[in-house]
Amino acid sequence: MALLAASKSSTLKVYKMNSISLSDISEAQVILKEVLVETPTVQMKSDRWEGILPDIKGGAIKMELFQQAGSFKARGAYLGIQQISEREKLKGVVAASGGNHALAVAWAAKKAGVSAKIAMPKATDEMRINGCHALGAEVILCRDIADAFSKMETCASDEGRTIMHPFEGRHMTLGSATCGAEFVTAHPEIDLFIIPVGGGGLISGMATAIKLIKSEAIVIGVEPYGADSMFQSLKAGTAVKLDKVNTIADSLGSPLAMPYSYEFVRRHVDQILRIEDDDMRRSMRTYQDILKITAEPACAAALAALVGPAKDLAIGKQVGLIACGSNISLDRYHAILDASG
């Protein structure tokens, strides 16, 4: 699948912060081309899907779980490190995450030869903690995600490290836009895209690229009821913070939306739908049964929406889903499924 035409520039330019163009996306693709995977798509044509999917015309799933570091997060993390100065690279980067962003920053830092510290909650899946260690990052274990963000801020202040935010900022949105551009370019027939929403880093970029390339396409976001910060933000007309988060999908468990990604979502996303945790559990099983993949809850969210609240919208349409990532241990995978309500 051909990338969008782009210049050979190896560094990101200075852009208007609230605008992303096709030229911006194609330039980012050039930067990422040598280090990332242009992930495959799988068409939902197998007879095994019969009786599961609504009456769609056709569909494809973009398999970002096969990306470097196991998720789409590698795109934005690598762009983020590439855009900092050489002086900043010498001081290193720091991130706070219990999810896929932790592994993505550790991977991107190793690739760029930059020191990385990752603040992670103690309850983080051991696979992710060990993965960060294996990539050469220093892991700081914290009480919870709030403590992890506090440690990240302290580390940045004390050591001069550059913060790599898990979803807010141009590099994260632009990285995800390269994913959206790949998908819509490979499958121009798709007219309805369903994309998981955590903090908004994935959908803000994918929706922007999709609408730039195929403006008539419909973009639907999906959030758990227990972590619906973007749904509530759009309802309020501004980025909001939730009082609490309660979902099995830790990768979608952001307690807040933030202004940068929220603004792109407001402009380019047609609707946000919500799903229950058990909807994701069922779709995790479906992915295992049909595609033989071990999908974490967030990875199964788009499928859960398609067979749930989006099923009527999808009738007669070509549908695109994204399997956004899957860094989950088998122990945690089975524990989540066994806890089904």
Describe each region flagged by the PLM:
Residues 3-4, 10-341:
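PLP-dependent amino-acid enzyme catalytic core
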